[in-house]
UniProtKB/Swiss-Prot annotation:
Annotated coiled-coil segments of the chain: 1159-1197
Sema domain segment(s): 18-444
Organism name: Caenorhabditis elegans
Organism ancestry: Eukaryota, Metazoa, Ecdysozoa, Nematoda, Chromadorea
Bilayer-crossing regions: 1140-1160
Assigned GO CC terms: cell leading edge; cell surface; plasma membrane; semaphorin receptor complex
Name under which the protein is recorded: Plexin-2
């Protein structure tokens, strides 16, 4: 059996085809940049020079070359609230903006190379920046999620932005907000927004808004995909992963579809939680886990072809009428309709479904750790980032296209960057890694470590390719030429590889797979020369001319490329010189192409034809040797002697001795020469003999010499030499001079010096070797004459004179060895030492069992086991190779393999001819097997304890663990052998082995198969892929910097790297001195242990004392031992440092008291100075308050009536619009119906059929029911539907009235049934109530002339009162207003100016006009337009953007008046910027202004926009531009001194406000007193206080409510609430708040505030609950509290009067309806409305058809069939998913 060392050697060399370790990695350069705030996202610029990083409140650009900041801009914090508008001007009740951090949700590079950034503030709106991060535009459109924790994904495709965002706080300023949308760039509006036929967006229903979390979006072919995780509505159900798909050009989202992705394990375990996902070419790679906190991740690979087919299967099922659409969260969950007539393929964009067929894949790889990001590297590798600062690298399995094989890991970041790898982006040969607080640039591959093409191509790194021009291993991206997949193969040596000096011959290299030179050249370099020669490439290799060499040499010839110094091949190259051969024979017999030039008598490679010798004299070596010291003639045979010139004498020369040579025909006879050599100890040697003539050497031959003295040292050896040597023995030495006395020589007696062995078994058979002198001259001299202790010994080996080996026969005693030498004369030699015959025996053996495979080391105990010459052991008749013989009583052997388990085998010891059997047999048992190892991780240094489970483990006595290179042959050992401890048959513990440094080089991570050395059991020598151990980098701990101070009762925290990758807390042994510190926590970079409370002695872990008083901290993990440094306990150091501490404390107290005194003195001076300053400011505040109070008192006493001029302005009469215009405003003011694409595509006959269908009330009721029951329909859509129905029904007003009344009755009954009776007409969130309010407004319009007159006078009075004082052009705040929210709380100079205006239409006339010096230019232009076009209706007046004002300045000429400076100048100013006023231009009383037409240029266009957010000329046709309050102000500066709720800086110079806001509340009384009469008149007219008659339709409406209240059992109070809400809230409040419905007047922010107060007062008058008013009540309610209290009883009286009035007769009602029908007949747009209504019905056709079919009465009227017929006609011209309606029988 083989010993262990041989076993390891064989395994290490087993099939050595693999010549390198399976995984190699090289340290990579890393660039890192830290951020103070959390990083949200990053992108790389298109020029690959800059990284744009969005972090908390910042946007930064980094230079990739040096990772330094180029530009940076601050994004926040900003004043924001989700309950406020984007500009912060309006908020919901009790909400105010507050400082909010900005978290970037979208970061993209636009096609214009601008940066698009969308944050979590301002409703998720976006901004654009240029490359230097200067702000370009700000949008107010909500695009991203406006919550830090909500998800948003985006992608730019075809100049469009794909956005998927999770729902956040339900703010009315964001609703409706799409979950997935396509937005146009740069406007960011949703494509086809508002189109009734569909828009490029989907909206989640309220119940599902918080269910979707979007993770990733990508494109594949012509589809867009979005990946989302969906939380089920039922908590018991698991989360699901949904893959959303729609076509790139689908602007209506008809193709919107979803499928479920599932990743399952081998045991069918579902992994529902998606951690990361990436799409790469035709694969979708995703990482899943069982939960969000699971430490294990599983990777699944989905084929994009399977994804496409799964979508197709689901769509095809729905197309065939199977299943339902299954998209309830977006309002599409109706049953699928058979549409088999529609062609469908895998790329179809016509249908979209949710589907019930999911896509399931099995897990391809499991990772211990949570994967947070994925990145694909071409089609070769996948990188997975984890939460532990690691990047796990995978490559695609060569045999299974969807299988991943891990080939390495990288650790990135440091302690400051955080540990989660959030995002990875490939950047050339690098990867940019985003971590929570850092951006890292890391190398992708480890190719630079491989130096040869073969190593590169067999490397486990799939990114490594061999770049031929540079002769380096790199990635394909770095190589200028195509990388090669085959290494060049050099076929033999270059031709020629040998050249002569002074010659030049082209040298050819035969190389296979040598690519042609593209972008480089091949070059040849000879030896160490720095220059090279260009080589010519051919299909078979290259050739290059050689240099001309002047001296012989052997060197390397290198084949290089022109851009690399790494040789492609290297060969030995020889330059020879024939002239170095001095004789003709040596010249002619040389291995080079040399010839002998006889004429020149020299050797050359180029002799002339006549000079070249054809034959040379060749002396043959001498056959018989010559004795050294003899003198004799030497005869040598030779050939070609006839070529010699016999006219000259020839001589022989040996060792500088010369003798005359006689030349015969075939021999040379040299005269006698004395052959002597001094100081030689060699028995034989060779010396050269030269044949010379005339100082030239003809040839040289070797002559053999010998020395008899050195050939034999004793007499017998000398006489036994060959007679030809003529050696003889005399004078006690062997010499050729004794040849004559050889026959008479007498040798010394034979002598035995020693023999071995000295004992043997009595059975004989022992071979004894006897050493001595003169033991005969031949074997015959001693044959049969050797006796050992009296027993014959037969010769088996004989060496003349000095050694005899013989085999002894049986014997029983001890005695010497006798040898008789000689034949004629006998001499006897006898040994002085005795040989003993002994008896061998075996007593016992251990162990007596072992594995069937053999190899058990069995130890035998007995007697005389070391005797004899040959010892062997057999077990069961098979050899048991002896490992060692420890002594004569112990020997060890390795058992052979057995034939059957459980078989007993005899153990026999053979010593020569002796056989001894052991009494106990040896038992063969089952081979051990390994089932599992735990844990399966270790580090390079090894030494970690692992537990091995298996069967029959105790069959062997020892086991050793090692790692091998490959799970399949060929493989070799890559570690040392680690010992194991066998506990029982199923369990043993092993230490993990140390990885050999020569193998690993710098391995960071690898998984290696495991093997065990367990006797001869080969089944466990390689456990294959089943059990592989992960090898991690060694854990390292940072040494202490100096002495570490520690509190004894606290835990000791140690910092390091790779601590928990392959180690648990129990693997670490931490010693403080010689006492343990027990580990409680291990993190990847931190180790926490609990040690002794008191400081141990100053020793190491072994208790060996060290210098100093502090103990040493030592950490032992596995075979690693780390000394971190000394530690000192704080309480231990206290006594020695107490005195210094007290002294320092006293010094500190003295210094502190001194400083405090100085500071106190200075603070006191500052406080006195501050007090004087505040006192002065308080006096200014008192003066301002006093001034404001006096002015307010004066206004209260003097301004309570309108001036005559104002009265004229009021008495102009109401500017009522005509009835058709009123109806158009009423129906479409909130709903744009300017165009209808569907009308052009709809056939007239279809519209006629549809209109006929509307003549059935049941059909209209069904439409309303479908809308009311659909929770996904928004309020605006309901309003649009109500307007469409009213517009269509106005063709027949009587029928319209019947429909509205019937719907109202049903609605009242339903509200009462649902216990919502008191809410009727209050919220108006139903289609019925909206239809009623529009119908009621139309009916009352012609009867409201008195009320409209009062309302118009009130409007003019409010307008005059507001314009009498300054109005802020930005905020709308006015000095004179009745709305507290819009009260101007500033002291503004109200100087009135009288100016002259020259209109551009009447240049010779001027108009006098009163304005305020503080008026902005846009306000002046409004007043000018109102004065000049006083008698022109407002809608026909020119807009203020259509003319300009020029100031006729006598000194400066004409000065153009504008609100702001040009954009270029404005951008350099500090924001906010004040709007210019007349005072700023120096305009005073009597100045002249001239109107001129506006000239539109690019600059003026930008100026006119004035950062208003307006994007078209039409939007500028308002009464005034809308200026952003964040950038502009007029009268109220945001940082002004008025005491507001804004917190001021402590170092602000104006610590106190200029005034108190409450002081200005008296202006409300002034304004109220002025307009009070008009308000009362209007309210009384609404209450019909002065009229005895009422509109018939009002009586009709009230009677209906009374009847329905009686029928449904509703109380009188609730009925009166119905009347008040229906009459006031739904009709009059709408008129008051929107005067543009009835008057041709402009829109104004300040007027809107005033009218809101009037509307609130009117509603308070009709309120039936007594309000509780106090100091904290809104001022607007307190203003008219007395009037409300007076008028509230009159509202009740109004209802009673109407109720008690005579009932409305049918004739009177019919007349009223006929009159209304005549009025509405002039209205237009019903065809357009009919077409839009048809489009809506088509979109909800399935639901409507189902409702119609469920009603028996409607089915009898065949309404479902009629609807189906209409919609089928529509399908021929416009076919999409919402139109899939079939007949419902």
């Amino acid at each position: 059996m083989l010993p262990e060392s041989v076993f390891l050697l064989l395994i290490s060399h087993f099939l050595r085809a693999v010549t390198q370790p399976p995984f190699e990695t090289e340290g990579v350069k890393q660039k890192l940049f830290h951020f103070s705030g959390h990083i949200d996202d990053f992108i790389v610029s298109r020029d690959q020079q800059t990284i744009y990083v969005a972090s908390l409140n910042r946007l930064t650009s980094l230079s990739i070359s040096n990772f330094s900041i180029q530009h940076e801009v601050s994004l926040g914090p900003v004043q924001d609230s989700p309950w406020c508008s984007a500009d912060g001007k309006s908020c919901l009740k009790d909400n105010r903006p507050f400082p909010t951090d900005v978290r970037t949700k979208i970061l993209q590079i636009l096609p214009t190379n601008q940066i698009l950034q969308c944050g979590s503030v301002k409703l998720g709106s976006c901004s654009t920046f240029n490359s230097k991060l200067s702000l370009i535009t700000e949008s107010t459109i909500a695009v991203a999620a406006n919550s830090p924790d909500a998800s948003t994904v985006s992608k730019i495709i075809d100049n469009r932005l794909i956005v998927a965002a999770s729902a956040t706080k339900e703010s009315p300023y964001r609703d409706p907000f799409p979950a997935v949308a396509i937005r146009n760039l740069p406007g960011l509006n949703v494509e086809n927004a508002g189109d009734l036929e569909g828009e490029a967006a989907v909206f989640l229903r309220a119940a599902y808004k918080n269910a979707f979390k979007f993770l990733y979006t990508f494109t594949h072919q012509h589809f867009v995909f979005v990946v989302a995780m969906v939380t089920p509505r039922e908590s018991r159900l698991p989360m699901t992963t949904r893959l959303i798909r729609f076509c790139r050009n689908d602007t209506k989202f008809e193709s919107y579809s979803e499928i479920e992705l599932q990743c399952r394990g081998e045991d069918n375990t579902n992994y529902p939680f998606l951690n990361a996902i990436i799409q790469s070419y035709d694969k979708l790679i995703a990482s899943f886990s069982t939960s969000s906190t699971s430490p294990k991740s599983s990777i699944c690979v989905f084929s994009m072809q399977k994804v496409k087919l799964t979508f197709w299967y689901n769509v095809d099922r729905c197309r065939s009428g199977t299943d339902s659409i299954r998209l309830p969260h977006i309002g599409r969950d109706t049953k699928c309709v058979n549409k088999a007539h529609i062609p469908l393929d895998e790329d179809s964009c016509e249908l979209g479904v949710g589907g019930s067929i999911e896509l399931v894949e099995m897990s391809t790889k499991d990772i211990m750790g949570k994967v947070t990001s994925l990145m694909a590297v071409d089609q070769k590798a996948i990188f997975a980032g984890t939460t532990t600062s690691q990047i796990v690298m995978f490559k695609w399995d060569e045999h299974h296209s969807n299988q991943l094989e891990e080939y390495g890991r990288k650790e990135v970041g440091d302690g400051r960057t955080g540990s989660e790898v959030s995002k990875m982006v490939k950047f050339g040969d690098f990867v940019i890694v985003q971590m929570p607080y850092g951006i890292i640039l890391e190398e992708l591959s480890t190719c630079s470590h491989h130096s040869s093409c073969t190593e590169c191509l067999v490397s486990v790194d799939p990114l490594c390719q061999w770049c031929h021009p540079t002769q380096s291993c790199t990635t394909s991206a770095r190589c200028t030429s195509p990388v090669t997949s085959q290494c060049p193969i050099v076929d033999g040596d270059p031709i020629p590889s040998i050249v002569s000096v002074n010659s030049s011959t082209p040298i050819s290299f035969n190389i296979h797979h040598l690519p042609p030179p593209v972008g480089f050249t091949y070059r040849c370099q000879f030896g160490t020369s720095t220059s090279s020669i260009k080589a010519n490439w051919t299909t078979t290799g290259v050739s290059c001319p050689s240099e001309i060499f002047t001296s012989p040499n052997t060197f390397e010839i290198l084949l290089l490329t022109s851009i690399s110094n790494n040789p492609i091949s290297r060969h030995n190259f020889t330059v020879y010189d024939c002239s170095g051969y001095g004789t003709c024979s040596s010249c002619m017999s040389s291995e080079y192409n040399c010839a002998w030039c006889s004429g020149l008598h020299k050797c050359s490679n180029s002799c002339g034809a006549l000079e070249k010798s054809k034959a040379c004299v060749k002396i043959q070596p001498m056959r018989l040797p010559i004795a050294i010291g003899s003198q004799q003639e030497i005869v040598l045979e030779a050939s070609n002697l006839d070529t010699l010139d016999r006219r000259h004498e020839h001589f022989c020369k040996v060792n500088e001795q010369v003798s005359l040579a006689k030349i015969a025909s075939d021999s040379i006879r040299c005269g006698k020469i004395q052959l002597t050599l001094s100081n030689t100890t060699s028995a034989n040697m060779v010396v050269p003999l030269s044949l010379i003539t005339r100082d030239s050497v003809i040839d040289i031959a070797n002559v053999s010499l010998y020395s008899c003295t050195n050939l034999a040292s004793d007499c017998s050896s000398c006489l036994a030499l060959s007679p030809s040597l003529s050696c003889g023995w005399c004078n006690r030495q062997c010499s050729h001079e004794c040849h004559e006395s050889k026959a008479t020589a007498v040798c010394d007696p034979p002598r035995i010096d020693k023999f071995e062995p000295t004992s043997g078994p009595i059975e004989g058979g022992t071979i004894i070797k006897i050493y001595g002198n003169d033991l005969g001259m031949s074997v015959e001299d001693v044959r049969g004459k050797i006796y050992v202790a009296g027993s014959r010994c037969n010769i088996v080996e004989y060496h003349v004179s000095n050694m005899i080996a013989c085999q002894v026969d049986k014997g029983v005693s001890s005695g010497p060895i006798r040898i008789s030498v000689g034949r004629a004369t006998v001499a006897v030699a006898e040994s002085s030492e005795l040989y003993s015959f002994v008896r061998t025996s075996i007593f016992s053996a251990y162990p007596l069992y072992g594995p069937i495979s053999g190899g058990t080391r069995i130890t035998l105990y007995g007697q005389n086991l070391s005797s004899g010459s040959q010892t062997s052991v057999t077990v069961g008749g098979m050899p048991c190779p002896i490992e060692r013989v420890n002594s004569s009583t112990v020997l060890t052997c390795l058992t052979p393999s057995g034939t059957r388990i459980g078989k007993s085998a005899r153990v026999v010891v053979h010593v020569d001819h002796s056989q001894t059997q052991l009494d106990q047999p040896f038992e063969y048992r089952s081979d051990p097997s390994i089932s599992s190892i735990f844990p399966m991780t270790s580090f390079k240094a090894g030494g970690r304890i692992v537990y091995v489970q298996g069967n029959s483990l105790n069959t062997v006595q020892t086991a050793k663990l090692f790692l091998i290179s490959s799970p399949t042959p060929p493989f070799y050992i890559i570690s040392d052998l680690a010992p194991c401890h066998i506990i029982n048959s199923t369990l043993m513990t092993c230490m993990t082995p140390k990885i050999l440094e020569t193998i690993t080089r710098r391995v960071e991570y690898t998984r290696q198969p495991v093997g065990f050395h367990m006797d001869n059991v080969t089944a466990v020598a390689n456990l294959g892929r089943r059990i592989q151990m992960g090898i991690y980098p060694n854990p390292t701990l940072s040494p202490f910097k100096g002495v570490r101070y520690h509190q004894g009762e606290q835990s000791l925290i140690l910092e390091g790297h790779n601590l928990n990758l392959a180690a648990e807390p129990n693997d670490f042994k931490i010693f403080i001195g010689n006492e343990r510190c027990y580990v409680t926590l291990v993190d990847v970079r931190q180790l926490v242990c609990s040690g002794p409370v008191r400081q141990p002695k100053a020793t190491d872990e072994r208790g060996i004392p060290i210098n100093g008083d502090n103990p040493l901290v030592t950490v032992i993990v596995g075979s690693l031992r780390m000394e971190l440094g000394l530690i000192e306990y704080s309480d231990h150091a206290l006594p020695s440092r107490l005195s210094l501490l007290i002294l320092g404390l006293l010094l500190f107290i003295v210094v502190t008291l001194t400083v405090m005194c100085l500071v106190f003195k200075r603070r006191r001076q500052e406080r006195e100075k501050e007090y004087r300053k505040i006192q002065l400011q308080m006096e200014n505040l008192e003066n301002n308050v006093r001034k404001e109070c006096k002015q307010a008192f004066a206004e209260l006493q003097t301004n309570l009536v309108l001036s005559p001029k104002s009265a004229n302005s009021v008495n102009l009469g109401p500017e009522l619009i005509n009835f058709p215009h009123f109806v158009e405003n009423l129906l479409w003011s909130d709903n744009n119906l300017t165009s209808a694409p569907s009308l052009a595509r709809t056939l007239p006959v279809t519209l006629a059929q549809f209109h006929a269908l509307l003549s059935f009330k049941g059909f209209i009721f069904t439409i309303v029911e479908a809308a009311e029951s659909d929770v996904s329909i928004s309020t605006s859509e309901k309003s649009m539907l109500a307007s469409l129905l009213i517009s269509v029904l106005l063709r027949n007003f009587s029928y319209c009235t019947e429909v509205v009344v019937d719907l109202l009755r049903a609605h009242i009954a339903r509200s009462v049934q649902n216990k919502r009776a008191e809410l009727l007409f209050r919220n108006s969130d139903s289609v019925v109530e909206k239809m009623f309010s529009k119908w009621m407004s139309i009916c009352l319009y012609s009867h409201l002339t008195p009320q409209m007159n009062s309302y118009f006078y009130l409007y003019k009075a409010l307008q005059y009162q507001t314009d009498k004082g300054p109005v802020d052009a930005v905020t709308g705040d006015a000095r004179y207003t009745i709305n507290e929210a819009k009260l101007l709380r500033e002291s503004v100079d109200t100087k009135t100016l009288k100016i002259r205006v020259i209109p551009f239409e009447k240049c010779d006339e001027s108009i006098d006009l009163e304005v305020h010096a503080c008026d902005a230019i846009c306000q002046v232009k409004q007043k000018v337009a109102s004065a000049v076009y006083r008698e022109t209706p407002y809608s026909q007046r020119p807009r203020i953007t259509q003319f300009e004002l020029k100031y006729k300045c006598p000194k400066r000429g004409d000065v153009k008046l504008t609100d702001v400076l040009p954009i270029e100048t404005l951008s350099q100013k500090k924001l906010p910027v004040k709007l210019f006023t007349l005072a700023d231009y120096g305009i005073s009383d009597g100045c002249t202004l001239e109107m001129s037409p506006a000239v539109y240029t690019a600059e003026s266009y930008r100026n006119s926009l004035a950062d208003s957010g307006q994007s078209s000329w039409s939007s500028l046709d308002r009464c005034s531009p809308i200026y952003s309050s964040s950038k502009y102000y007029h009268l109220t500066n945001p940082s002004s001194g008025t005491m507001t709720f804004k917190k001021k800086s402590s170092n602000d110079s104006n610590l106190l406000p200029k005034s108190i806001p409450e002081v200005y509340l008296t202006r409300l009384l002034t304004s109220k007193g002025t307009v009070e009469t008009y308000v009362e008149d209007f309210l009384e007219s609404v209450l019909y206080m002065h009229d005895s008659s009422y509109p018939p339709i009002l009586k009709f409406f009230f009677d209906i409510l009374d009847r329905e209240a009686s029928v449904n059992g509703v109380s009188e109070n609730i009925c009166q609430q119905w009347k008040a809400n229906g009459y006031v809230l739904r009709v009059w409040a709408n008129f008051v708040r929107n005067p543009q419905l009835v008057f041709d007047v402009p829109h104004s922010i300040s007027m809107d505030a005033n009218l809101s107060t009037v509307a609130q007062t009117m509603m308070d008058c009709f309120s039936f609950s007594e309000p509780v008013l106090g100091a904290h009540s809104p001022s607007s309610r307190l203003l008219f509290a007395k009037d409300v209290a007076r008028l509230r009883p009159l509202s009740v009286d109004l209802f009673k009067r109407v109720k008690n009035s005579p009932p409305l007769g049918m004739d009177e009602l019919r007349t009223e309806l006929v009159n209304m029908a005549n009025d509405v007949s002039t209205c237009k747009g019903s065809s357009l409305a009919l077409s839009e209504l048809l489009s809506w019905v088509r979109g909800n056709g399935i639901r409507i058809s189902q409702l119609l079919s469920s009603n028996e009465q409607f089915s009898q009227q065949r309404l479902p069939q009629k609807l189906s017929q209409v919609l089928h006609v529509c399908l021929e011209t416009d076919n999409h998913i919402y139109s899939t309606i079939s007949d419902y029988e």
